[in-house]
Amino acid sequence: MDYFYGTSPPPEYERYASIVDAATLVQGFLWALNYGEASYRSIKDRTYGMAIFPLCCNYAWELVYTVIYSSQNKYERIIMTTWLILNSIMMGFTIKFAPNEWRHAPLVQRNIPFIFLAGVAAFVIAQLALAATVGPGLAMNWVAALCYLLLTIGSLCQLMTRGSSRGVSYTMWLSRFVGTYVGVICVYFRYNYWPQNFSWVDEPIMKCFSGISLAVEIVYGVTLWHIRKQERHHIVEKSK
């Protein structure tokens, strides 16, 4: 995303800017769908679908790069604001229903709001420190990749720990998966035609984050399919 202040896109990039903007809007819609579906599943199953630690990181990222810093791209500004609003709603439902998943750990169960407050505050401070160190443009994109890595790993661990599909769905998985990797279109054009600001895309750390996230997403989809298959089998067995 374009948080590189004081710079303008070169003419060779401008020819493809409309393609990047279109991909950005698709990405924005799919992640908005993810947040909406997560809120719906929270209400329906009285639980939460996004793991607590990654959710705090993701929410802090949206807070920092919507309220404190702002994208130079008008579409990204609209999308980030929309995400922050929807994520706030989702977090509210998460705080409300999270105690249902922590009956085995009363200390956690009684302190869910404080855990979220402390988690978000810590991630906000860390992200502001990183932005002050390397600049908001680089920090924003690095942390976006980190957030997604944490979300994928956290979601898979949570799914396997629960052994149940409560709080999640194929819609949540696919909107997260496709909504992230449609961003490859943006990355391709910005890296090739705006290298002054986006050469970091080719750094080993970004390749590492992207590769691990992709592998985990595929494993998540297979695991969700297997668990849903087991749940359908149990329903059939109970109906006999």
Curated annotation (Swiss-Prot):
Pfam families: Pyr4-TMTC (PF25129). The keyword Transmembrane applies. GO terms for biological process: terpenoid biosynthetic process. Its EC number is 4.2.3.-. The chain crosses the membrane at residues 16-36, 48-68, 78-98, 112-132, 134-154, 167-187, 205-225. Belongs to the paxB family. It is a multi-pass membrane protein. InterPro entries: PaxB-like. One of its GO terms (molecular function) is lyase activity. Its main location: membrane. GO terms for cellular component: membrane. It is found in: Membrane. Compounds in the chrodrimanin family such as chrodrimanin A or verruculide A exhibit strong inhibitory activities against protein tyrosine phosphatase 1B (PTP1B) and therefore, they could potentially be developed into drugs for the treatment of type 2 diabetes or obesity. Furthermore, chrodrimanin B, the end product of the pathway involving chrodrimanin A or verruculide A, does not exhibit the PTP1B inhibitory activity, while it functions as a potent blocker of insect GABA-gated chloride channels. The lineage of its organism: Eukaryota, Fungi, Dikarya, Ascomycota, Pezizomycotina. Glycans are attached at residue 197. Terpene cyclase; part of the gene cluster that mediates the biosynthesis of chrodrimanin B, a meroterpenoid that acts as a potent blocker of insect GABA-gated chloride channels. The first step of the pathway is the biosynthesis of 6-hydroxymellein by the polyketide synthase cdmE. The prenyltransferase cdmH acts as a 6-hydroxymellein 5-farnesyltransferase and produces the hydrophobic metabolite verruculide C. The FAD-dependent monooxygenase cdmI further converts verruculide C into verruculide B. Keywords: Glycoprotein, Lyase, Membrane, Transmembrane, Transmembrane helix. This is Terpene cyclase cdmG. Pathway: Secondary metabolite biosynthesis; terpenoid biosynthesis. It catalyses: verruculide C epoxide = 3-hydroxypentacecilide A. The keyword Nucleus does not apply.
